[in-house]
A protein has these predicted regions:
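Short, Lys/Arg-rich, polar N-terminal cytosolic tail immediately upstream
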Residues: 1-23
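Transmembrane catalytic cores of multi-pass membrane glycosyltransferases
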Residues: 43-120, 175, 221-365
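Short hydrophobic alpha-helices at membrane interfaces in multi-pass membrane enzymes
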Residues: 197-219
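Intrinsically disordered, polar/acidic, low-complexity terminal segments
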Residues: 18-92, 106-150, 392-509
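Membrane-interfacial entry segments at the cytosolic side of transmembrane helices
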Residues: 205-209, 245-259, 330-337, 393-412
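Transmembrane alpha-helical segments
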Residues: 125-137, 187-199, 232-241, 314-321, ...
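Membrane-interface micro-motifs in multi-pass membrane enzymes
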Residues: 56, 147-196, 224, 348-382
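Hydrophobic membrane-spanning alpha-helices of multi-pass integral membrane proteins
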Residues: 260-262, 337-350, 372-379, 408-417
């Protein structure tokens, strides 16, 4: 009797699994995860209508804004941004791409356009990640496009939604932080993707990709120092591998974008402004910065970055990577080397802020580190999974069943865990944080108070403006504010932007 019942239960379970297999095809899984990701972005983009500039947005964009207000053309504004870039290269920093982009916050064209900041940054982050992973998984590893897309969606969900609260405003909503770090990070991903694409393309397609990669390489080299250093390390390792394997004859054209990047790299490093800025900061010596980076990477990975949703979603990627490895002729022979390189690459990203500033506390820096950690962790897990598949070769039928159970278990646990997490911690995910501030009204109140301030700034009847402090400061939108001191640099920046004499917050009576 027991054997009969066990047999029936086994048959019923097998039928259920086969039904799930037919339902959960790679194409449908990719579509489902895409819908989930797009839905998760909606609150982040909706709350953007209450987003307003602060701090460096005013100081960096004031001159371009004044030219535009005086009836200047777009070309004159761009020319002013270029002049500012040259001036900063001599007097403040060598990151020419960041200097140029920083001079063009959306509010220089109109205060009501600042909502575009998260749209622009999230589009760049999403598009560049999709493109890079497609080139790695589909072009290099011969994966099917649907499995590759599913992995990309999981990576983006982790990257955007699991970023901890302190980094979100600077990574997505504050233009001066988002454009210099998240956007430039996206440029580097596009650069990597174009290098891979050019390596596999032929004829005119290769020429076009090499030219595009050369432009992006130069722009990436002029971005923030964290991205610049990481890209240089990746390219040097690539040069070493291609030289060792004698691949230059068939990929000689790659020297153009690589060379263009290093021309920009040298241009950014030798800038006189770097030495001026270094004199105003107290950073660590190079050896200490490297050692602290190696420790800091491990410390952050354990204490900050590796949340339970990240672990669950990475586990969900394992059967997808296994499926890719089954059909790939890639050998995955060096898992230890790849993991160590990944650890070194993420650690290296900590070194520039430690060397230049002596700390890495800024939210935008923390966000960049998290983005890189998620990408490197994903690729390392994929490589180790591929190595295990090639080494042990379990039968494909068991693989498929185990993969289905793994995916279902991960998604069920993620859904249940998220429900019981966001109730006591509504700001746990980026999307739920946005929904919380939208539903409780704090975002709307903040937006209304910002609009009231803007009206006062544009009122030419008084050049000495006093404004009330904000009654609400939504966690996703509020970065910093002016003070009661008219000589504070943030106050001066706002006053200069709107051509006022002074701007202050009213002192408490």
């Amino acid at each position: 009797m027991n054997n009969f019942l066990e047999s029936k239960m086994r048959q019923s379970g097998e039928k259920w699994i086969k039904g799930i297999q037919k339902l959960l095809t790679p194409k449908r899984l990719a579509a489902l995860l895409t819908v989930v990701y797009v839905i998760s972005l909606m609150p982040l983009l909706w709350i953007a209508k209450y987003n307003y500039p602060s701090a460096d947005d005013y100081t960096n964009g004031s001159r371009c804004h004044q030219i535009w207000e005086m009836g200047g053309s777009v070309f004159r504004v761009m020319g002013e941004a270029l002049l500012r870039t040259v001036d900063e290269w001599f007097t403040w920093r060598g990151c020419y791409t960041s200097s140029f982009l920083s001079a063009l916050p959306p509010n220089i064209w109109g205060d009501n356009l600042y909502f575009l900041t998260p749209w622009l940054v999230l589009l760049m982050l999403s598009g560049s990640m999709l493109y890079l992973l497609h080139e790695i998984l589909v072009k290099a590893m011969k994966a099917d496009q649907y499995t590759s897309h599913s992995i990309s969606m999981l990576v983006l969900l982790i990257t955007v939604q699991c970023l901890y609260e302190q980094g979100r405003v600077e990574a997505f909503y504050w233009y001066s932080g988002a454009i210099n770090y998240t956007f430039v990070y996206g440029l580097s991903l596009l650069f990597y993707g174009l290098l891979i694409s050019a390596g596999y393309a032929k004829g005119k397609k290769r020429t076009v990709r090499l030219i595009m990669a050369s432009v992006l390489g130069f722009l990436t080299a002029g971005g923030n120092q964290m991205t610049m250093l990481n890209t240089a390390i990746v390219l040097l390792v690539m040069i070493g591998i291609m030289t060792y394997r004698k691949k230059w004859q068939e990929h000689l054209g790659l020297l153009l974008p690589i060379g263009t990047f290093f021309v920009g790299f040298v241009l950014a490093v030798i800038a006189p402004g770097n030495f001026v800025r270094a004199g105003a900061a107290q950073g660590m010596n190079p050896i200490k910065a490297i050692l602290v980076s190696l420790y800091g990477c491990l410390d952050l990975a354990v204490d900050e970055w590796t949340s339970w949703p990240l672990i669950v979603m990475v586990i969900a990627m394992v059967p997808l990577f296994w499926h890719i490895a089954e059909k790939s002729d890639f050998t995955f022979r060096y898992p230890v080397v790849v993991v160590l390189f990944g650890y070194g690459l993420v650690s290296a990203m900590l070194t520039p802020p430690l060397f230049a500033l002596g700390n890495m506390e800024a939210g935008r820096i923390q966000a960049m580190l998290f983005f890189m950690y998620v990408l490197v962790l994903t690729l390392c897990v994929g490589y180790i999974t591929g190595w295990a598949q090639k080494k042990y070769h379990p039968c494909s039928e068991i693989n498929e069943k185990a993969g289905i159970w793994c995916l279902l278990g991960c998604f069920a646990f993620l859904l249940f865990g998220s429900l019981i997490t966001v109730i006591p911690e509504p700001h746990y995910y980026s999307a739920t944080s946005a929904m919380t501030d939208l539903l409780n009204g704090s975002a709307g109140v903040y937006g209304a108070e910002q609009r009231g301030r803007t009206e006062l700034y544009h009122d030419r009847s008084n050049d000495m403006v006093e404004v009330d402090d904000f009654s609400e400061k939504p966690s996703l939108l509020f970065f910093s504010d002016i003070t009661a001191d008219e000589n504070d640099w943030t106050n001066k920046g706002v006053a200069r932007f709107y051509d006022l004499e002074t701007v202050v917050i009213k002192k408490d009576e």
